[in-house]
Amino acid sequence: DRDETAFIIVDAPFRLNQTEAISWKQGTTATENGEDGLVTSNTYSAVYYPHAYTTNPATGDNVVAPASHIALYTFAYSDNVSFQWFAPAGLTRGQVQNAASVGYLTSENEFKSVSLTQGNRDTMYNAKLNPIARFPAEGVVVFGQKTLHPSASALDRVNVARLTAYLRERFSVIARPFLFEPNDEDTRRNAKSTF
């Protein structure tokens, strides 16, 4: 039990084109998470699409990397140059190195590159499916930060959900010395100055 201090990055199945990925994300025919759809609405989760065509640094071979790999890279990069409460997306913190294109696997197991238009990206984003797009001048960029939070609020953004998870984890550590202390003015003053 992580007490909602973790963040889960979810992949759409590799074989789905963008229309199928949106249908899968909306999970209209699914009764549980799986190939038929995604039914979860966890605040501390986000789905990214499509996958990326990249190079394995160990072998030099071209491989298809899952969208979660690309998203995780941008999370790490964003955290390195800013903080958890900055969006790991966009042209500043969402650029992906070492990815030539984005797409999906066909039924013949071939990588099919896709080009997401503004309309495609908007439709995906409204369906809580974070687009990974290739821009001519900028390259591959994570261009969304929606969580699977069930309603419109600040928590339907990755940066806010990650900040909340981070604060939960930090508060449990910071508050530990005050356990079993008397609930008096001195303890409250010490706790307030600590927080």
Regions found by a protein language model. Give the residues of each.
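Structured, hydrophobic secondary-structure cores that serve as assembly/anchoring elements
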Residues: 1-194
